[in-house]
């Protein structure tokens, strides 16, 4: 969207090295989303012929008007019968207009059919403590019964939600992470899990969550309710993103699928 300010929102990323943590500084003031006002977007036109409306907690964090515009769009999309996909995307440093993140995110999630987030984001948005993920390698065993009970509790809070998707990460060192994924299908009352990726070295962790969500939406649209396949595809895309510099996951569907079934490292000729 072009506005009179013509400012592009930026973020500045300081990489983690050894004992030094990574740090993100946001520069979103006067960007198009920051200056968004209710009524500026003609949602009826935007949503025409759409099947899925995807919303993000980042947009809701930028300003009250951006949040209210997002909520307007969600309510209209629900009325039109669209699938609502919500990425919690909690970014503490973006919130500053007076409302509590929990209250806003909780409301957004109540309208959603599919909810994405990592373990910490689910805790902030729901108020329910997360289950620790402490994998040091790919042999770690996830407590499936504990997660099943956890997601049943989440479904009580968000009864409209049909699929709850969580990426879990353990940062062992700045360049060594373990990564896994979970999907709870509320209709089936069934939990799906993935393999654990033991990733070392990490090239760039930025955009890993976005890669996970984008891959899931793609998979869900293409393969429907093949829950295990969609989850495996999503985590594979997310894992690959850790090896790619920059914020974009420059990878093809074929590469993601190949990574699902291989250990990597081979020369592709």
Could you describe each region identified by the protein language model?
Residues 63-68, 95-100, 245:
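Short, solvent-exposed loop/turn segments at secondary-structure boundaries
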């Amino acid at each position: 969207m072009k506005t009179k300010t013509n400012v592009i929102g930026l973020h500045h990323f300081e990489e983690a090295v050894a004992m030094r943590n990574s740090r993100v500084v946001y520069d979103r003031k006067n960007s198009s989303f920051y200056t968004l006002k209710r009524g500026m977007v003609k949602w009826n036109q935007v949503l025409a012929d759409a099947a899925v409306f995807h919303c993000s907690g980042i947009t809701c964090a930028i300003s009250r008007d951006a949040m209210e515009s997002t909520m307007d769009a969600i309510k209209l999309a629900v009325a039109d019968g669209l699938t609502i996909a919500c990425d919690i995307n909690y970014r503490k440093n973006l919130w500053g207009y007076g409302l509590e993140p929990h209250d806003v995110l909780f409301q957004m999630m109540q309208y959603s059919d599919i909810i994405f987030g990592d373990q910490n984001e689910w805790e902030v948005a729901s108020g329910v403590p997360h289950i620790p993920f402490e994998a040091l390698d790919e042999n770690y065993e996830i407590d499936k019964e504990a997660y099943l009970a956890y997601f049943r509790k989440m479904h009580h809070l968000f009864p409209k939600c049909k699929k709850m998707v969580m990426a879990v990460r353990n940062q062992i060192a700045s360049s060594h992470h373990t990564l896994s994924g979970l999907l709870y299908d509320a209709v089936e009352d069934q939990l799906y899990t993935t393999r654990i990726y033991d990733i070392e070295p990490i090239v760039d962790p930025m955009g890993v969550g976005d890669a996970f969500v984008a891959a899931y939406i793609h998979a869900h649209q293409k393969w429907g309710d093949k829950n295990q396949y969609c989850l495996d595809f999503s985590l594979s895309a997310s894992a690959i993103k850790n090896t790619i510099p920059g914020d974009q996951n420059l990878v093809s569907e074929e590469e993601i699928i190949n990574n699902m079934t291989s250990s990597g490292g081979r020369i592709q000729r």
